[in-house]
Regions:
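Short amphipathic helix-loop junctions that connect adjacent transmembrane helices
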Residues: 29-45, 233-250
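Structural signature of the two symmetry-related core transmembrane helices
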Residues: 77-92, 171, 281-296, 376
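Conserved MFS/SLC helix-loop-helix module at the cytosolic interface between two early adjacent transmembrane helices
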Residues: 61-97, 274-280
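Paired small-residue
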Residues: 89, 100-108, 293, 304-312
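Cytoplasmic helix-loop-helix junction between adjacent transmembrane helices
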Residues: 105-143, 326-327
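Central cavity-lining transmembrane alpha-helices of secondary-active solute carriers
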Residues: 50-66, 257-268
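Helix-loop junctions on the cytosolic side of multi-pass membrane transporters
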Residues: 178-195, 388-398
């Protein structure tokens, strides 16, 4: 079967954008919706936090299971399963009658997710190796754009159509993504019987760069911790910097989005540079840049200064995403690539759980600026680990 990987990339990008957006679009109005479900005001914050974190947590737990199934049945089938499953769970949120049903459906959304890692594995297995950095960098912008634009879309839809209708509209959009994936995405995959699938022990033996792979998982975790650790305190930090709360929500939205703009704009180009000079070098450069962005964030005096640093931080994200995914695709044996990407997604999801918890805990104990310093320490540790893992490649000036 002749595979048009460029068309697969386009449809996968659309799917990654809307599945990524569906995770984040509830952020602006979720506390209000929980309150409308009859929850006591004293418990709204608790249940809001649970409703957000339970999705990432359940997705992290089941991700390896779906990855293993993808290696047996195919990545396209898992993309269809994830899109169809999220169509049902997101749409059903419009009909929940209490906060406990909301938590159950948010939990099931995470359980049935997995579109993004399987799309990544699909494209990684089909794209020519010399274009893998560019292709995976382009694909990564879909998930990032969806995650960052999701709250804006959700807020606008809630304003225009009401809270419950947002979930119905989201379900319809995800249904369209399901249909596009069914009819437009192609994969030449021969199903493998369960007894013929290589074990994890055998898969580990076939990975020649295991320390590097573990380091890439940690980089994914740190990337998400850094991205989400400020989410509980950003609006409050901006209010303190500006001395006013009148426009703190608007400014915080702009500051969050500005990092996404630079990440989306730079990721394909940085992926292409990685194809030429070595993805490990681009990854190290991205980590160093993020360190030099996080440290001064603790000492800014105005929201504008914070916004400038967030803009440059986006270039770091644009460097890290394609580099991590491309290196994983090159390290992973073809018969286990979906499982490897599913473990990377597990670390990604755990980062989304750990980040807000770390940020709120540090801010409560030591103040808002300390959040950026603790995040910087995590990034610095990641740099040391990455330099150690890449030392032979750096000395011999070779690439994977």
């Amino acid at each position: 079967m002749k595979i048009n990987w460029r068309r697969n990339l386009l449809i996968s990008w659309i799917g990654c954008f809307f599945t990524g957006a569906s995770f984040s679009l509830v952020m602006p109005f979720l506390p209000v919706y929980i309150e409308q479900l009859g929850t006591a005001k004293s418990q709204v914050e608790l249940f809001s936090g649970l409703a957000i974190s339970v999705t990432a947590f359940s997705a992290a737990i089941v991700s390896p299971l779906w990855g293993s199934l993808a290696d047996r049945k195919g990545r396209r089938l898992m993309m269809i399963r994830a899109a169809a499953g999220m169509t049902i769970t997101m749409g059903s949120l419009a009909f929940v009658t209490n906060v406990y049903w909301l938590l159950i459906m948010r939990f099931m959304t995470g359980v049935l997710s997995g579109y993004i890692p399987n799309a990544t594995a699909l494209i990684a297995s089909q794209v020519p190796k010399q274009k893998s950095g560019w292709a995976l960098g382009t694909l990564a912008t879909g998930a990032v754009a969806g995650n960052l634009i999701g709250p804006l879309i959700g807020g606008m839809l809630a304003q225009w159509f009401g809270l419950r209708n947002v979930f119905i509209i989201t379900g319809i959009i995800l249904l369209i993504c399901t249909i596009l994936t069914v009819f437009m995405v192609k994969e030449d995959f021969q199903p493998v019987e369960k007894e013929d699938v290589i074990s994890m022990a055998e898969l580990r033996k076939r990975i020649h760069y295991m320390p590097i792979l573990i380091g890439l998982f940690i980089s994914t975790l740190i990337l998400q911790v850094g991205a989400t650790s400020i989410s509980p305190i950003l609006t409050l930090y901006i209010r303190d910097l500006s001395g006013s709360s009148s426009n703190a929500l608007v400014v915080s939205g702009l500051i969050v989005s500005i990092a996404g703009v630079s990440a989306i704009a730079s990721s394909p180009a940085l992926g292409k540079i990685g194809d030429r000079v070595g993805n490990h070098k681009v990854l190290l450069a991205g980590l160093v840049l993020s360190l030099f962005c996080f440290i001064p964030m603790a000492f800014v005096k105005t929201p504008f200064q914070l916004g400038v640093l967030r803009f440059f931080l986006g270039f770091s994200t644009g460097a890290l995403m394609p580099s991590i995914n491309t290196l994983i695709s090159k390290i992973s044996p073809p018969e286990g690539v979906s499982r490897i990407f599913s473990y990377n997604q597990m670390f990604n999801n755990f980062g989304q759980v750990i980040g807000p918890m770390l940020g709120s805990t540090v801010a409560h104990g030591f103040g808002y600026p300390a959040v950026f310093l603790v995040t910087s320490a995590c990034v610095f540790g990641n740099i040391i680990l990455s330099v150690f893992n890449f030392r032979k490649l750096l000395v011999t000036k070779t690439k994977i």
